[in-house]
Amino acid sequence: MNFPQAIIDASALRHNLQRVRELAPRSQIMAVVKADGYGHGLTRVADVLVAADAFAVARLEEATALRQAGHRCPVVLLGGISDKEQLQLAAAHRLTLVVHEFAQLDLLERVRITSPLPVWVKADTGMHRLGFPPQVVAKAIARLRCCPAVASVVGLMSHLASADESEDFLTPIQLQTFEGIAAPGLLRSMANSAAVMVYPYAHFDWVRPGLMLYGASPFAHGTGAAVGLKSVMTLQTRLIAIHHLRPGDSIGYGATWVCPEAMTVGVAALGYGDGYPRHAVSGTPVLVNGRPVPLVGRVSMDMITLDLRTQPKAKVGDPVIAWGPNLPVEEVARHATTIPYELLCQVTGRVPRTME
């Protein structure tokens, strides 16, 4: 195949889930598979991560897709619901809701459903995105416990804003706030991937790993391999053209890169239309025949151009890897001034995923 494909390593997924268990042995695992399993394929990933204790998604459509694929474990809808139709659909699929504002609570009190739902309550401990202010959490819990649409209030959760930052002053404050919220009898959940790795006292009853399941590090200067994770996605393609250029020849849109000498370049079938970052700069590493070569010129919609001076025997059809076990997605993200989350999630639908 001369076009891009994403190879998904099932054994690496299972390994990374086990790594979470090793780091948080006393916690249950809510595997975060939102955004199409971080670009790896929602149901494909869930089928491999069946040993997780629950799944977490952001959208109702993701949750129903898991149910339709046959998954019967708890599926937690992190964003909750916003109207009667969504609530009824959530009830029909036996989902677990996150309730993070009073409009959702009002809806649960107003609408009658035949199958009451378990809920988590979300508190805003400092990220100021979703969640009840700490001082009203007890009131929200009390109302939910009296609500006919609520089967049970399972637990209290919050989200860490900067656990992945090297100079993180906020996480201890958030944890102190979280622990100060009165929620007797409720399970607790706070830890994302970064906190699973470096804040064991944030593990509580449930951890919510996302990025680390897919083998990447949430830390700006780290790699998943450095903490015992295995890369799950290999984004690969092939060379589709070889050119022998002269000194002064320019490459790509805008003629932004000029050949310093007579040299060979290769064109690979991969571009921003496939999810490769358009802002990857010249010098971004790409593997040709397993060896690194630099990207040169701008990324096009369907193609990238590579400096083959260190690969004089490269030919049309040779394999090209944009990221994978031997070229961390974190490194590519740094060259594109972005984060691995974005690179994995933005691999487009025209790139076929193959589980191996």
UniProtKB/Swiss-Prot annotation:
Q: Which Gene3D superfamilies match?
A: Alanine racemase, Lyase, Ornithine Decarboxylase, Chain A, domain 1
Pfam families this protein is in? Ala_racemase_C, Ala_racemase_N
Cite the binding residues for substrate. Answer: 129, 301
**Catalytic residue positions:** 34 (proton acceptor), 253 (proton acceptor)
Name the source's superkingdom.
Answer: Bacteria
Which keywords are on file for this protein? Isomerase, Pyridoxal phosphate
N6-(pyridoxal phosphate)lysine PTM positions read: 34
Task: Please give the Gene Ontology molecular function terms for this protein.
Answer: alanine racemase activity; pyridoxal phosphate binding
What EC number is given for this enzyme? 5.1.1.1
Pathway per the UniProt entry? Amino-acid biosynthesis; D-alanine biosynthesis; D-alanine from L-alanine: step 1/1
A GO CC term assigned to this protein in UniProt: cytosol
Q: Which reaction(s) does its UniProt entry say it catalyses?
A: L-alanine = D-alanine
**Co-factor(s):** pyridoxal 5'-phosphate
GO BP term (any one) = D-alanine biosynthetic process
User: InterPro entries in the record, alphabetically?
Assistant: Ala_racemase, Ala_racemase/Decarboxylase_C, Ala_racemase_C, Ala_racemase_N, Ala_racemase_pyridoxalP-BS, PLP-binding_barrel
Role this protein plays:
Catalyzes the interconversion of L-alanine and D-alanine. May also act on other amino acids.
Q: Which family does it belong to?
A: Belongs to the alanine racemase family.
Instruction: List the protein's name.
Output: Alanine racemase
Which organism is the protein's source?
Nitrosococcus oceani (strain ATCC 19707 / BCRC 17464 / JCM 30415 / NCIMB 11848 / C-107)
Query: What is the gene name?
Result: alr
